[in-house]
């Protein structure tokens, strides 16, 4: 398994994962909304998305959004989204994604 920053060519498979993530939170399936949202994030660079992949298949993702800390007077990243496909759970994917976010 490899964890890396998402790239534009990940748009389609990442959109499917994001749609699954939203369905997990009881939102109706809506691949167009998922694709539009993820496409905007990838194109605008206003979030950092890490993906876990194995043999070319995306297994999960985590998405971080920028914020600022007044106390430390610096930028920080808020982990807002973490999702692992049902078929890839209990295999360390979530842990690897969390580690990538922490290291960022």
Feature annotation, model-predicted:
Residues 62-75, 80:
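Conserved donor-binding loop and adjoining core beta-sheet/short helix segment
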Residues 52, 90-95:
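Glycine-rich acyl-CoA binding loop
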Residues 2-16:
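A short beta-loop-alpha structural element at the N-terminal edge
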Residues 51, 57-66:
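Conserved beta-strand in the GNAT
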Residues 82-89:
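A short, internal acetyl-CoA/4′-phosphopantetheine-binding micro-motif in the GNAT/acyltransferase core
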Residues 39-51, 78:
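A short helix-loop-beta-strand connector motif used in the catalytic cores of GNAT acetyltransferases and
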Residues 85, 96-104:
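Conserved acyl-CoA
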Residues 15-40:
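Conserved GNAT-fold acetyl-CoA-binding loop/helix
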């Amino acid at each position: 398994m490899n964890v890396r920053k998402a790239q534009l060519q990940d748009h389609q498979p990442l959109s499917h994962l994001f749609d699954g993530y939203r369905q997990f939170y009881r939102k109706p399936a809506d691949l167009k909304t998922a694709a539009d949202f993820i496409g905007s994030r990838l194109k605008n660079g206003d979030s950092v998305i890490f993906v876990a992949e194995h043999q070319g298949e995306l297994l999960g993702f985590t998405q971080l959004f920028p914020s600022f800390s007044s106390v430390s007077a610096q930028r920080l990243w808020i982990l807002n989204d973490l999702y692992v496909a049902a078929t890839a759970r209990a295999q360390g994917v979530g842990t690897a994604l969390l580690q990538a976010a922490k290291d960022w």
